[in-house]
Regions:
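Bacterial N-terminal signal peptides that target proteins for export
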Residues: 1-8
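Short, linear, compositionally biased motifs with a strong N-terminal bias
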Residues: 10-13
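N-terminal secretory signal peptides
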Residues: 22-74
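Aromatic-rich beta-strand edge motifs centered on tyrosine
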Residues: 51, 75-77, 111-113
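Mid-chain, structured segments of secreted extracytoplasmic proteins
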Residues: 63-103
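C-terminal partner/receptor-binding element of secreted or periplasmic proteins
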Residues: 105-141
Length: 141
């Protein structure tokens, strides 16, 4: 009986370990970050963060900050092929940027982007150029 219990406990531990490893494996890993403020892409600054998953799948999160709010773009891609995208627009509910906190930001637009759209592809390529080729080759190709 103790052997059966021991075997059952071993199987359960192994199963939960595999599930944990699988869920950890499927998460995005931050591999690159860049402040784009010096490029003057928006009035109050901007930045991008590149995340990678297995099999060359990457996601680029780009934030543009303005005086009245911020825009957040998210692009998923493999190599240089855009596979998905989204755009969220937030407005600050206070007059001064120094007073902005998480509870003082309101989501005013949440849209999926069409990865086949020429305009979306152009926006993606315009930002994609700020990630060094060696980083893209290592994680996204």
């Amino acid at each position: 009986m103790n052997v059966v219990k021991g075997l059952l406990v071993s199987v359960l531990c192994l199963s939960s370990g595999l599930l944990t490893a699988q869920s950890h494996h499927s998460q995005w890993k931050k591999v690159y970050e860049r402040d784009l403020t010096d490029f003057e892409l928006s009035p109050e600054g901007s930045g991008l963060v590149l995340f990678a998953k297995s099999q060359g799948r990457c996601r680029m999160d780009v934030d543009f900050y303005g005086e009245t709010g911020k825009d957040k773009y998210q692009y998923e891609f493999t190599r240089d092929r855009l596979t998905a995208g989204s755009h969220r627009e937030y407005r600050y509910t206070v007059a001064s940027l120094s007073e902005v906190t998480k509870d003082k930001i309101k989501l005013v637009r949440n849209e999926k982007l069409n990865p086949a759209s020429g305009a979306v592809k152009k926006e993606f390529r315009d930002i994609y150029q700020y990630v060094p080729n060696k980083v893209l080759k290592k994680y996204c190709f």
